[in-house]
Design a protein with these regions (language model features):
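Alpha-helix capping and helix-coil boundary motifs
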Residues: 44, 160, 200-203
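Conserved ATP-driven motor cores of ASCE-family P-loop NTPases powering translocation/secretion/packaging/pilus
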Residues: 102-188
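Active-site donor-binding loop signature of nucleotide-sugar glycosyltransferases
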Residues: 38, 144, 192
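General N-terminal targeting signals
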Residues: 51-53, 68, 132, 155-158, ...
Length: 203
């Protein structure tokens, strides 16, 4: 489908507001937690991907206008976080190798913007000529039945990749392999939201 036909479909679906008095600036739109649910578009992947591309570009342009915050602390010295962008089922956009996604990954830290890409398989992070694994410093690998030692080695876990691959295949709910710049790789258990709410209710 040509871009114009996809845009025509989006107009027909009335995705965007016509009355400018009912719209808000993008930075105001992003105030707080914002979830863009694409399931309402049904099986129309072309329109979904076009909408994601539009949102990524607007997010990037907004990021460039963000005031750079000073570092926090001295030892360690950490970057202040302004916002996080989470893309679920990210393989649907990584395959298109959008230049704006690469820019967000490479430039985001400078502006205190983090990008979280969630996908079912590690092989999704190598798309065509773009290797999305390179700019990603932190990984949470949940149960992946067919994960290989080679895939984990590509994340910098070469020391015991074979053993870790076998453990990843058998992980339970909320368990994952955690890897970051200051962690060579360890297995941890996440804190489910329902447990957090239960703990708050008991206080």
């Amino acid at each position: 489908d040509s871009p114009m036909s996809i845009i025509g479909d989006m107009l027909d679906m009335e995705i965007f507001e016509e009355d400018q008095s009912k719209t808000v600036p993008f930075d105001a739109f992003l105030d707080g937690v914002v979830v863009i649910a694409l399931d309402a578009l049904g099986q129309d992947d072309h329109s979904k991907n076009m909408l994601v591309a539009v949102m990524l570009n607007m997010f990037y342009e907004n990021m460039l206008r963000t005031t750079k915050l000073p570092f926090l602390g001295q030892d360690p010295q950490l970057r202040a976080i302004d916002s996080y962008l989470l893309v679920d089922e990210a393989d649907n956009i990584m395959r298109y190798e959008f230049d704006v996604l690469r820019k967000l990954l490479l430039q985001g830290r400078e502006f205190g913007t983090g990008v979280i890409l969630a996908s079912q398989y590690l092989r999704h992070f190598k798309a065509g000529g773009t290797d999305y694994r390179e700019p990603l410093l932190t990984w949470f690998v949940h149960k992946v039945p067919n994960v290989t030692a080679t895939e984990l080695s590509a994340l910098g876990l070469s020391a015991s990749a074979s053993e870790m691959a076998e453990r990843v295949k058998a992980l339970g709910n909320h368990q994952c392999l955690y890897k970051s710049f200051d962690s060579p790789g360890e297995f941890i258990r996440g804190y489910p939201f329902y447990e957090l709410m239960r703990a708050r209710g008991e206080q």
